[in-house]
Amino acid sequence: MLKSEKEEMIKELHEKFSRTTSAVVAEFTKVDVETVTKLRKKFREGNVEYKVIKNTLARRAAQGTSVSVIADDFTGPVALCISYGDVVAPAKILVEFAKDIEDKIKIRTAVVEGRKVDVAGVKALAKLPGLPELRAQLLGVISEPASKLVRTIAAPGSQLARVVQANADKAQG
């Protein structure tokens, strides 16, 4: 790789690392192509970027970004799983996928909004609901009082209508 290509790659990675909300460093050993393809598909579905990067380039690109706190972990055969939105997505996908092939994927560390997280933290993060689930829960919490209010306001009118209908039925019968 030419020096100009390396500099361009570092610049591109630095820009990505600057936008990162969370990233997980994982070691993949003896993983076959089919498994990596399935994993990449899961990452795409979760809007997570999966990158295998030269460690020296990744360390240089991480300087001055939130990813710099995990730059020392860029050693050996590692991949970086990056999210720009949902902070739990990379951890959730990796931990779920690692259950099937535990001996081949080893989670090393992660960074979540600028803070370094160890393996136990990554596993705990994976148990949290993702952004879509949180939005749905929040919507439910917000809409429930409004629904109760509408039912309460409508109740006297519907009760009155039932009384009038009962009287009408009684008069006809």
Swiss-Prot record:
One GO BP: translation
The UniProt record lists the keyword Membrane: no
A Pfam match: Ribosomal_L10
Origin: domain of life: Bacteria
Keyword annotations of the record: Ribonucleoprotein, Ribosomal protein, RNA-binding, rRNA-binding
Cellular component GO terms held in the UniProt record: ribonucleoprotein complex; ribosome
Keyword set includes Ribonucleoprotein: yes
GO MF term set: large ribosomal subunit rRNA binding
InterPro entries (UniProt xref): Ribosomal_uL10, Ribosomal_uL10-like_sf, Ribosomal_uL10_bac, Ribosomal_uL10_bac_type
Oligomer status and interactors: Part of the ribosomal stalk of the 50S ribosomal subunit. The N-terminus interacts with L11 and the large rRNA to form the base of the stalk. The C-terminus forms an elongated spine to which L12 dimers bind in a sequential fashion forming a multimeric L10(L12)X complex.
Family: Belongs to the universal ribosomal protein uL10 family.
HAMAP family assigned: Ribosomal_uL10 (MF_00362)
Known role: Forms part of the ribosomal stalk, playing a central role in the interaction of the ribosome with GTP-bound translation factors.
Protein name: Large ribosomal subunit protein uL10
Name of the gene encoding the protein in the UniProt record: rplJ
